[in-house]
From Swiss-Prot:
Membership in a protein family: Belongs to the cornifin (SPRR) family.
Location of region: Disordered: 55-76
Source species of the chain: Mus musculus
UniProt region (3 X 9 AA approximate tandem repeats), positions on chain: 21-47
Chain's role: Cross-linked envelope protein of keratinocytes. It is a keratinocyte protein that first appears in the cell cytosol, but ultimately becomes cross-linked to membrane proteins by transglutaminase. All that results in the formation of an insoluble envelope beneath the plasma membrane.
Sections of the chain in a coiled coil: none
Intervals holding Sequence repeats: 21-29, 30-38, 39-47
GO cellular component: cornified envelope; cytoplasm; nucleus
Record-level GO BP terms: epidermis development; keratinization; keratinocyte differentiation; response to estradiol
Protein name in the entry: Small proline-rich protein 2G
Inducers of expression: Up-regulated by estrogen in the uterus of ovariectomized animals, with strongly increased expression detected in luminal epithelial cells at 6 and 12 hours after hormone injection.
Length: 76
């Protein structure tokens, strides 16, 4: 058996690990030509609606009882 035949029967070796590709220099971060202005509202937001004073002060409206209960019975 020749030397080449012995090499042929040996298991194949894994290929060498390639180093990760390197950039020649780090990529620069994207730059804005000027800082972005903060978003502006066309006008200030309206305040949330508050209940009117009457709703806070007045008691809930009660339906009046029927007239038959208010009026005294007719006397003959």
């Amino acid at each position: 058996m020749s030397f080449q035949e012995q090499q042929c029967k040996q298991p194949c070796q894994p290929p060498p690990v390639c180093p990760p590709p390197k950039c020649p220099e780090p990529c620069p971060l994207p730059k804005c030509p000027e800082p972005c202005p903060p978003p502006k509202c066309p006008e200030p937001c309206p305040e949330p609606c508050l209940p009117s004073p009457c709703q806070q002060k007045c008691p809930p409206v009660q339906t009046p009882p029927p007239c038959q209960q208010k009026c005294p019975p007719k006397s003959k």
